[in-house]
Design a protein with these regions (language model features):
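Gly/Pro/Ser/Thr-rich low-complexity, intrinsically disordered segments predominantly at protein N-termini
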Residues: 1-160
Length: 160
């Protein structure tokens, strides 16, 4: 994980910066660059988005987005996958999906990468739950485990 501690930026100033690859996030007034996804991470992400959309998108119930910047509650993060209920998807004047998402997703999914802090990722999920997210998943590919977080409930753990 790369941190750029140069000067303290506001969230508004951070959002004016050009995007980085991999994405950078704004958390607690710090810019933190996400690690580059590796094979297991990419394989899981690549399977989940179409699987979720195959179920929820035809009914216009919800839609899954990979690597979508969500800015809310003083942070700007890029979860691996977010799902928004159809009626909450921001739209532009033409009715197309907007470029800017300034709300917490309904479901956030993070896939742990080898170079990523489980604590940092868990804090991002908890931040989402605090701001209206209904469910958060933390997938640990190496342990073949999914941690499921819901507001005001005990975390559940599912092993493969």
């Amino acid at each position: 994980m790369v941190q750029a501690p140069s000067k303290t930026l506001t969230l508004a100033e951070f959002l004016q910066l050009p995007e980085t690859k991999p994405a950078s996030e704004y958390i607690d007034s710090q810019i933190i660059q996400k690690p580059m996804p590796q094979g297991k991470h990419s394989a899981i992400q690549g399977e989940f988005v179409p699987a979720i959309n195959g179920v929820v998108k035809p009914q216009r119930a919800a839609r899954a987005f990979p690597e979508l910047r969500c800015t809310f509650g003083g942070r700007s993060t890029v979860p691996d996958i977010v799902v928004f209920v159809w009626s909450r998807i921001p739209r532009d004047d033409n009715g197309a999906v907007a470029n800017t998402f300034s709300a917490a997703p309904d479901w956030t999914i993070e896939i742990l990468s080898p170079d990523q802090s489980q604590t940092k990722v868990t804090k991002n999920i908890l931040h989402c739950l605090k701001h209206g997210t209904q469910m958060g998943w933390l997938i640990d590919p190496d342990e073949q485990t999914v941690f499921v977080f819901r507001p005001k409930q005990e975390m559940e753990v599912f092993d493969a």
